[in-house]
Design a protein with these regions (language model features):
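Beta-propeller blade termini and top-face loops
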Residues: 1-201
Length: 201
C-alpha cells in the first residue's frame, strides 16, 4: 500500500496518495510541465527482486498523465503509440524550452526510445538501436538540453548524445579502454538550466 505517487500541498507536512496500481508497482520517474504544475507524467514500474530472482515488468508498468494535479490519471497504451504487451522500466525527459516535447526510454519486448510532440498523449518510436542504452532495468535515465529540444543524452554504461531528437546517437563518454578514470556506470546527469554546455556526471 505504500507504493505509488504521493502529493503534498503544505510543503511536505502531509502527503496524499494520488496514484496507485498494485503492491508490486512503484514510480520509476515523474516529470512536471514547467509551465503548468498540474500537468504531470508518471512512469510506473512493476518489478520484483529477491536474492535469487529478479523480474522487471508486468501489468502494472505504464505511462500515466494528469492535467488536474493528480486528481485523475489517464493511462497511455498502444492506442497512443506505445509498445504492446507488458512494459518494464520507463525513463522520462521533457524539453523545458518546449514542454510539449517529451522522450520516453521504454523497456519492452523490444526496448526503444519514444517521443511525444503533444505533451504526452500520442507517441512515436524514434529509435530501437543499441545507442539508446543497455540493461534498461538498471539504467533508464535520459536528459534533454534545456535550450535544445533535439539534443538528448542517455546515460548508462556509456554516455551517448543525439543531436536530431533521438534518431541517432553518438558516444560522448567512452566506458572501457578509456584514460579518463571514469567508472563505467552513469546513474545521474545534470545540465545547467541556462547553459547546456555545463554538465555534471
Amino acid at each position: 500500500p505504500e507504493r505509488g505517487i504521493f502529493k503534498t500541498s503544505d510543503g511536505g507536512q502531509n502527503w496524499e496518495k494520488v496514484l496507485y496500481v498494485n503492491s508490486r508497482t512503484g514510480a520509476a520517474d515523474l516529470i512536471m510541465d514547467p509551465t503548468n504544475p498540474n500537468k504531470l507524467i508518471a512512469a510506473l514500474w512493476e518489478h520484483k527482486r529477491d536474492p535469487w530472482f529478479f523480474k522487471s515488468g508486468g501489468k502494472g508498468s505504464g505511462l500515466y498523465t494528469t492535467i488536474d494535479g493528480g486528481k485523475t490519471w489517464a493511462r497511455k497504451t498502444e492506442k497512443n503509440g506505445l509498445p504492446e504487451g507488458d512494459l518494464g522500466r520507463i525513463g522520462l525527459a521533457m524539453a523545458f524550452n518546449k514542454p510539449t516535447i517529451i522522450y520516453a526510454l521504454i523497456e519492452a519486448k523490444k526496448n526503444a526510445l519514444y517521443k511525444s510532440m503533444d505533451g504526452g498523449d500520442q507517441w512515436v518510436k524514434v529509435n530501437d538501436g543499441p545507442g539508446i542504452g543497455n540493461r534498461p532495468f538498471y539504467y533508464s535515465d535520459l536528459f534533454v538540453d534545456p535550450q535544445n529540444e533535439n539534443r538528448v543524452y542517455t546515460v548508462f554504461t556509456y554516455v551517448n548524445v543525439s543531436e536530431d531528437g533521438g534518431k541517432n546517437f553518438s558516444e560522448l563518454m567512452p566506458a572501457y579502454n578509456a584514460n579518463n578514470g571514469v567508472h563505467p556506470d552513469h546513474h545521474a546527469w545534470w545540465i545547467h538550466p541556462d547553459d547546456g554546455s555545463f554538465m555534471i556526471d
